[in-house]
């Protein structure tokens, strides 16, 4: 039966992950030449977020033996 609790709670599961993700965010923004902030376009911010996701997936695949699921 379905659980009524939302699975999208943004709760950190790994201690220190927030700092690592923030560091990754600023490194990628620097690589892309994006200045993060309120004046940055959604497209620019989205490109940084998309790249974070891409790199996290690559890291997970490497740790799982490089297999695709």
Swiss-Prot record:
UniProt site positions, description: Cleavage: 27-28
GO molecular function, one term: double-stranded DNA binding
GO BP: DNA topological change; sporulation resulting in formation of a cellular spore
InterPro entries: SASP_alpha/beta-type, SASP_alpha/beta-type_CS, SASP_DNA-binding, SASP_sf_alpha/beta
Pfam families: SASP
Transmembrane segments: none
Record bears the keyword DNA-binding: yes
Keywords: DNA-binding, Sporulation
Additional facts recorded: SASP are degraded in the first minutes of spore germination and provide amino acids for both new protein synthesis and metabolism.
Protein family membership: Belongs to the alpha/beta-type SASP family.
Record function comment: SASP are bound to spore DNA. They are double-stranded DNA-binding proteins that cause DNA to change to an a-like conformation. They protect the DNA backbone from chemical and enzymatic cleavage and are thus involved in dormant spore's high resistance to UV light.
Protein name: Small, acid-soluble spore protein C4
Lineage: Bacteria, Bacillati, Bacillota, Bacilli, Bacillales
Gene (UniProt): SASP-C4
């Amino acid at each position: 039966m379905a659980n009524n609790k939302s699975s999208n709670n943004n709760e950190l599961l790994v201690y220190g992950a927030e700092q690592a993700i923030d560091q990754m965010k600023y490194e990628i923004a620097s690589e892309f030449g994006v200045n993060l902030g309120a004046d940055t376009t959604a497209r620019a911010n989205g490109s940084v977020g998309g790249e974070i996701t891409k790199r996290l997936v690559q890291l997970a695949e490497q740790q799982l033996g490089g297999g695709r699921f």
